[in-house]
Design a protein with these regions (language model features):
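Phosphate/nucleotide-binding beta-alpha loop and adjacent structural elements of enzyme active sites
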Residues: 1-258
Length: 258
């Protein structure tokens, strides 16, 4: 049975992230009925292109699997990484095919985004989805961790659930050799310090690095944390971050500066 069966979807509508998603799919997406049917029943062929209304006008987004559609709904429907209208600087660890980046970049015409994504195929798709925004984002093909180096990275077929194999989730170690790539790892603190040498502060730090979110959060040093306003991390654990209040919204831990 579909993971988004009618029964599970109906019960989910009574939880805030999902009724927000339902409302925003109707409000912002062209062809909302098709989106809902694809999302609930996991039907339809891919790749596919969808259009969503944003503060900067209608944007077309290419998705390559049902998993990408889930990401699309998470970003523009559920608004997992909700950004204020006046957001100006975003750092995105784990940018995948650029859906979250497109959400951030379309909040207003002045947003600057620093993007990090180690999988070459994802980067190609990201650049396609972000056409027209090239002057407002920088992309580095790096994985983000707590120290610099190189390591094997599991790159599964959807591109959504890959991650560093060493010390990562156990299922990644089962990735066959043909789906492993060697990637460059950069320290989160070093990357953020370099960005903060050019800017006063980071409005939003988004972390979606398949199992290393908690480790990166614990590794961030106070001189860096003190210049970040919001953090969104794909994790369900109740991890504290000094100087921040936290809440859980679906599968995302949201941190806001005290």
């Amino acid at each position: 049975m579909s993971r988004h069966s009618i029964k599970s979807f109906s019960s989910a509508l009574f939880k805030k992230p999902f009724y927000v998603a339902f409302f925003n799919i109707i409000r912002f997406f062209e062809g909302p009925l098709e989106i809902l049917i694809r999302y609930v029943f996991e039907t339809g062929s891919y790749p596919a292109k969808f259009a969503v209304k944003t503060p900067l006008g209608l944007q077309k987004i290419s998705v390559f699997s049902h998993d990408d559609l889930i990401t699309l709904v998470e970003c523009f429907g559920k608004q997992d990484y909700v950004a204020p209208e006046d957001v100006s600087l975003v750092v995105d660890f784990g940018s995948n095919i650029g859906i979250s980046a497109l959400y951030f970049l379309t909040r207003n015409p002045n947003v600057k985004a620093y993007l990090f994504e180690p999988v070459p195929r994802n980067v190609e798709r990201l650049k396609e989805n972000l056409k027209g925004f090239e002057t407002r984002y920088e992309i580095k093909e790096w994985a983000i961790g707590i120290k610099e180096g190189r390591a094997d990275f599991a790159s599964e077929k959807t591109g959504r659930y890959g991650g560093l194999i060493k010390d990562g989730p156990s299922h990644l170690s089962q990735c066959p050799p043909e789906r492993r790539i060697e990637v460059k790892i950069q320290s989160a603190n070093k990357v953020l310090r370099e960005i903060l040498s050019k800017h006063d502060s980071v409005d939003i730090l988004k972390i979606d690095v398949e199992g290393f979110e908690a480790e990166i959060l614990a590794h961030l040093e106070m001189d860096v944390l003190g210049r970040i306003d919001r953090i969104y991390a794909e994790m369900t654990t109740d991890q504290k971050v000094p100087g921040f209040l936290s809440e859980h919204y679906g599968g995302v831990a949201r941190y806001s500066r005290v």
